[in-house]
């Protein structure tokens, strides 16, 4: 029997006065970790408020101490000074909102802001559009609501955009120019539009004229225009599905007619539906394939005056319906 075991049975008084055992093994490691954790806590108290929060240390069994671990911070939302304050009920935390902005939402808000449309209007004014009613109408109508979502970011650029069925929405500068020519500073009572398309130009016209009649020959575009205009609750637009070259004799005469497609000439039926003193604006194609924005004024029951203005490019004016 070893000397150690010999000391245990029986136990003498001096054997009972043993020194406390020194921490060994994992208990020592725990105590060392606890000391390190306390040092980190002390350092964190002196660090700026932006440091990661520390999880308080927990006592382990048998007197040991578990090491305190830094709380894992969200990668997309680093803490900022004052971020520990609770955000208002129902809202996002300020740190989350600033560190990880929703790009798509920001883009949508930018598109719908008045500032974006105002920049477009400033470009129109710089390009010569002067009628305040036309500029106000262009500023008020949200063009991005009339194009495909994938093209919404380009809605306020001065560009024609596809709307399907081999048709396009005209450039803002062309829309403003045609409406300004048709109005000529007058108070418009009744206006006819040939080629509704997606409904954007009709929406702008509705803010310049008392009543707007618009004809579309492509049935899916006619339905789309109705859907696009519905959220705007425009009460003075009357959409018609039919042949634009025929016009709307039942609603004539019109103070102004705006044709959003190019033919080799202006249909006679539309000239007849123009009121005396009325103005018709249309792109007219030439044999060489070029198109010219043309203004026609009815000066007498059987007399019209024609003026050729700007070079333009429009989809062709066709007969019938599809």
From Swiss-Prot:
<dbReference type="GO" id="GO:0036211">
    <property type="term" value="P:protein modification process"/>
</dbReference>
<dbReference type="Pfam" id="PF01135">
    <property type="entry name" value="PCMT"/>
</dbReference>
<feature type="active site">
    <location>
        <position position="170"/>
    </location>
</feature>
<dbReference type="GO" id="GO:0030091">
    <property type="term" value="P:protein repair"/>
</dbReference>
<dbReference type="GO" id="GO:0032259">
    <property type="term" value="P:methylation"/>
</dbReference>
<comment type="similarity">
    <text>Belongs to the methyltransferase superfamily. L-isoaspartyl/D-aspartyl protein methyltransferase family.</text>
</comment>
<dbReference type="GO" id="GO:0005737">
    <property type="term" value="C:cytoplasm"/>
</dbReference>
<feature type="compositionally biased region" description="Low complexity">
    <location>
        <begin position="76"/>
        <end position="91"/>
    </location>
</feature>
<comment type="function">
    <text>Catalyzes the methyl esterification of L-isoaspartyl residues in peptides and proteins that result from spontaneous decomposition of normal L-aspartyl and L-asparaginyl residues. It plays a role in the repair and/or degradation of damaged proteins.</text>
</comment>
<keyword id="KW-0808">Transferase</keyword>
<protein>
    <recommendedName>
        <fullName>Protein-L-isoaspartate O-methyltransferase</fullName>
        <ecNumber>2.1.1.77</ecNumber>
    </recommendedName>
</protein>
<dbReference type="InterPro" id="IPR029063">
    <property type="entry name" value="SAM-dependent_MTases_sf"/>
</dbReference>
<dbReference type="InterPro" id="IPR000682">
    <property type="entry name" value="PCMT"/>
</dbReference>
<dbReference type="GO" id="GO:0004719">
    <property type="term" value="F:protein-L-isoaspartate (D-aspartate) O-methyltransferase activity"/>
</dbReference>
<keyword id="KW-0963">Cytoplasm</keyword>
<keyword id="KW-0489">Methyltransferase</keyword>
<keyword id="KW-0949">S-adenosyl-L-methionine</keyword>
<feature type="compositionally biased region" description="Low complexity">
    <location>
        <begin position="33"/>
        <end position="51"/>
    </location>
</feature>
<feature type="compositionally biased region" description="Basic and acidic residues">
    <location>
        <begin position="14"/>
        <end position="29"/>
    </location>
</feature>
<feature type="region of interest" description="Disordered">
    <location>
        <begin position="1"/>
        <end position="101"/>
    </location>
</feature>
């Amino acid at each position: 029997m070893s000397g150690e075991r010999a000391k245990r049975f029986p136990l003498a008084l001096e054997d009972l006065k043993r020194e406390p055992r020194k921490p060994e093994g994992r208990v020592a490691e725990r105590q060392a970790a606890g000391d390190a954790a306390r040092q980190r806590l002390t350092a964190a108290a002196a660090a700026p408020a932006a440091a990661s929060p520390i999880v308080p240390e927990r006592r382990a069994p048998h007197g040991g101490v578990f090491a305190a671990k830094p709380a894992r911070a969200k990668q997309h939302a680093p803490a900022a000074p004052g971020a520990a304050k609770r955000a208002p009920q129902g809202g996002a935390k300020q740190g989350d909102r600033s560190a990880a902005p929703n790009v798509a939402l920001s883009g949508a808000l930018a598109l719908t802001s008045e500032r974006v449309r105002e920049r477009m209007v400033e470009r129109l004014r710089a390009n010569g559009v002067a009628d305040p009613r036309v500029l106000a109408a262009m500023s008020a109508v949200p063009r991005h609501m009339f194009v495909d979502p994938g093209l919404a970011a380009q809605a306020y650029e001065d560009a024609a955009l596809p709307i399907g069925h081999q048709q396009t929405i005209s450039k803002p500068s062309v829309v403003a120019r045609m409406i300004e020519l048709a109005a000529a500073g007058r108070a418009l009572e009744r206006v006819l539009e040939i080629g509704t398309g997606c409904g954007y130009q009709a929406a702008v016209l509705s803010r310049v004229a008392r009543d707007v009649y618009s004809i579309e020959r492509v049935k899916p575009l006619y339905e789309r225009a109705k859907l696009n205009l519905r959220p705007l609750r425009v009460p003075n637009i009357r959409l018609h599905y039919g042949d634009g070259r025929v016009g709307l004799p039942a609603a004539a005469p019109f103070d102004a007619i705006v044709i959003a497609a190019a033919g080799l000439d202006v249909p006679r039926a539309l000239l007849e539906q123009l009121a005396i003193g009325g103005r018709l604006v249309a792109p007219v194609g030439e044999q060489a394939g070029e198109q010219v924005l043309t203004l026609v004024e009815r000066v007498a029951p059987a007399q019209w005056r024609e003026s050729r203005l700007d070079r333009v490019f429009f989809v062709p004016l066709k007969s019938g319906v599809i």
